């Protein structure tokens, strides 16, 4: 049934926090509508990557078309557009929301509203979506649907009288959800006769067919014989095929306004078919593109280096291929005195960084060294110019710069109020400015802080979860740059600057961080046959130092008794050799040492 009238199409997505049962609910909807046969069913059906199933998160968007017969006997087409729930992927979420008219807000009936759910709900409200609250996991012993309804009403302002209780695990409440989608989500605008415009909401790279683009037709129609124009990249393509996801791909001849489908057109790279771009026809182009297209800006940067120098071309190929399916990943070549050739990569956030690293190691079989993540600093120079620095090692000299500004975020933390003190302590340690505190219910509180992004990208999230036994959740948004007393902290190993260990820290914290860093490196760097000094410096001033003592080789082992002058000669020769070794010797710094920079907070540093 591909020729469904617009009035019988419903496009919707599911908004939920990680672990609140979004993928399980999607599985049940596919099963209940007969879209996926029971024998083909596997958990998290729409999460294609192994990594997604393992971590239990949705990274890339998927879409599925379901045929559904409503209670009054009419047939409908329901397009479910799956969305990632994590804050790093909010741009992916905003595009998928633009392709929908409604959203199921899934809230865990035992845990309540979480911060990232809220962020996505606000995005949905911005897009004028009809929101249907669903209380999931009501079969759990700790479920308290009435309290959660009150919470949703208090925090989001949604009327929860007709919230649907369900259990995605057992299938309870799923038929009611499908009926509610038909009854409450508005049909798409009937714009079949208007000029063709389609919104790209996802794309992925297929090694055989090039880029496969997922799109929603907003107006007009697209035929499999058309020639299309992508309005942001200004590129034109002959279509190879178009089709629908059911949820496996099925070819069709034509898709009209309101429908969701995919196209293949031998597109070489995902960057040519960017998410949020508008597809139109070459022979009858639309006057203007659909609103809301922005390029995803990387927020967190780190260096990626292969452990073996000859793997550099492989890493470049892997990044090229990964960028085909991940347009938010940015990278450029970089050389480091300590690590040789590698790449400086930009990511949307820490989770995005971890996932890219894991995919490179898994899918492309690479061994990588990853440097500590950093953010983009704005450096005001004495000559009046501005320099943006994403690599601490390239920070201009103190004599040339007037001030350094760093990005700040506004953070909202939701938690049970018994953890208030622990969270305020954490935010203060991280140079946070207290803004406000609101009680949502009698036992849940929202803390609002403004703090530097650099303090968030290391292990803020882990620390927050640890100090609140996993009960707190957070979301943050960028609010601009602020001046701070920042300095560059260098690490010298055996007198050589290890640029991969360079960090930018606040002046007041520099001594503690430096001290903790050299002590940590002393534990992690293996001993050599010569003494290795490890120093932390700001400019030319050494602020902390320690050294790794040499392994002593017993050169006198062969001298049984014998002449003292013979022993002296051997010891002198050894001392000479050590001197030469020290001058020539390269110290291998293990990967753990680079990661130690991240984890310094455990050692009372940054």
Swiss-Prot record:
Domain tr-type G: 7-189
Membrane topology: Peripheral membrane protein
GO molecular function term, any single one: GTPase activity
GO cellular component: plasma membrane
Localization, UniProt: Cell inner membrane
Keywords assigned by UniProt, alphabetized: Cell inner membrane, Cell membrane, GTP-binding, Hydrolase, Membrane, Nucleotide-binding, Protein biosynthesis
UniProt main location, coarse: membrane
Gene3D superfamilies on file: 3.30.70.240, Elongation factor 4, C-terminal domain, Elongation Factor G (Translational Gtpase), domain 3, P-loop containing nucleotide triphosphate hydrolases, Translation factors
Keyword Membrane (UniProt): yes
EC number annotated for this UniProt entry: 3.6.5.n1
Uppermost EC category: hydrolase
Cystines in this chain: none
Entries under InterPro entries matching the protein: EF-4, EFG_III/V, EFG_V-like, EFTu-like_2, G_TR_CS, GUFP, LepA_C_sf, LepA_CTD
NCBIfam families: lepA, small_GTP
Similarity-based family: Belongs to the TRAFAC class translation factor GTPase superfamily. Classic translation factor GTPase family. LepA subfamily.
Function: Required for accurate and efficient protein synthesis under certain stress conditions. May act as a fidelity factor of the translation reaction, by catalyzing a one-codon backward translocation of tRNAs on improperly translocated ribosomes. Back-translocation proceeds from a post-translocation (POST) complex to a pre-translocation (PRE) complex, thus giving elongation factor G a second chance to translocate the tRNAs correctly. Binds to ribosomes in a GTP-dependent manner.
Name of the protein described by the UniProt record: Elongation factor 4
Lineage of producing organism: Bacteria, Bacillati, Cyanobacteriota, Cyanophyceae, Synechococcales
Originating gene: lepA
């Amino acid at each position: 049934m591909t020729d469904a009238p617009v009035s019988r199409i419903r496009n919707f997505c599911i908004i939920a926090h990680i672990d609140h049962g979004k993928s399980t609910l999607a599985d049940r909807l596919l099963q209940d509508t007969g879209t996926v046969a029971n024998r083909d069913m596997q958990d998290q059906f729409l999460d294609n990557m192994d990594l997604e199933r393992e971590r239990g998160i949705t990274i890339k968007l998927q879409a599925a078309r379901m045929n559904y017969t409503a209670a009054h006997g009419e047939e409908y087409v329901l397009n479910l557009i799956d969305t990632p729930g994590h804050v790093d992927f909010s741009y992916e979420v905003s595009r998928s929301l633009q392709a929908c008219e409604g959203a199921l807000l899934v809230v865990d009936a035992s845990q309540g509203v979480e911060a990232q759910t809220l962020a996505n709900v606000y995005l949905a409200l911005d897009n004028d979506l009809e929101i249907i609250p669903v209380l999931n996991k009501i079969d759990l012993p700790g479920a308290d649907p009435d309290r959660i309804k009150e919470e949703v009403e208090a925090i989001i302002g949604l009327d929860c009288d007709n919230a649907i209780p369900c259990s995605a695990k057992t299938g309870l409440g799923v038929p009611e959800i499908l009926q509610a989608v038909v009854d409450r989500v508005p049909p798409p605008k009937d714009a079949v006769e208007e000029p063709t415009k389609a919104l790209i909401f996802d794309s992925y790279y297929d090694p055989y067919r090039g880029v496969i683009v997922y799109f929603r037709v907003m107006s007009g129609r697209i035929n499999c014989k058309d020639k299309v124009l992508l309005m942001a990249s200004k590129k034109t393509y002959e279509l190879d095929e178009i089709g629908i996801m059911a949820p496996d791909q099925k070819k069709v001849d034509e898709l009209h306004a309101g429908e969701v489908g995919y196209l293949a057109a031998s597109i070489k790279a995902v960057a040519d078919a960017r998410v949020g771009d508008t597809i139109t026809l070459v022979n009858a182009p639309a006057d203007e593109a659909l609103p809301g297209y922005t390029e995803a800006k990387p927020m967190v940067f780190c260096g990626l280096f292969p452990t073996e120098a000859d793997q550099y071309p492989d890493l470049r190929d892997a990044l090229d291929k990964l960028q085909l399916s991940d347009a938010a990943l940015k990278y450029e070549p970089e050389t480091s005195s300590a690590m040789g050739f590698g790449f400086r990569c930009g990511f949307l956030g820490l989770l995005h960084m971890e996932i890219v690293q894991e995919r490179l190691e898994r899918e492309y079989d690479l061994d990588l060294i990853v440097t500590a993540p950093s953010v983009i600093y704005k450096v005001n120079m004495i000559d009046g110019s501005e320099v943006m620095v994403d690599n601490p090692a390239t920070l201009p000299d103190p004599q040339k710069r007037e001030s350094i500004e760093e990005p700040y975020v506004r953070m909202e933390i939701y938690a049970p109020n018994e953890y208030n003190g622990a969270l305020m302590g954490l935010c203060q340690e991280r140079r946070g400015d207290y803004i406000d505190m609101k009680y949502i219910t009698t036992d849940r509180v929202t803390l609002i802080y403004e703090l530097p992004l650099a303090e968030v990208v290391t292990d803020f999230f882990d620390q927050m979860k640890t100090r609140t036994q996993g009960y707190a959740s957070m979301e943050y948004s960028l609010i601009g740059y602020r001046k701070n007393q920042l300095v560059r902290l260098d690490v010298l190993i055996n007198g050589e600057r290890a640029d991969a260990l360079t960090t930018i820290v606040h002046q007041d914290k520099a001594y503690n961080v430096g001290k903790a860093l050299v002590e940590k490196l002393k534990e992690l760097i293996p001993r050599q046959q010569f003494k290795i000094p490890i120093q932390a410096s700001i400019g030319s001033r050494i602020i902390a130092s320690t050294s790794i003592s040499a392994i002593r080789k017993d050169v006198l082992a062969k001298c049984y008794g014998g002449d003292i002058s013979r022993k002296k000669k051997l010891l002198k020769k050894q001392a000479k050799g050590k001197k030469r070794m020290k001058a020539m010797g390269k110290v291998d710094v293990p990967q753990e040492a680079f990661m130690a920079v991240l984890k310094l907070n455990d050692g009372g540093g940054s």
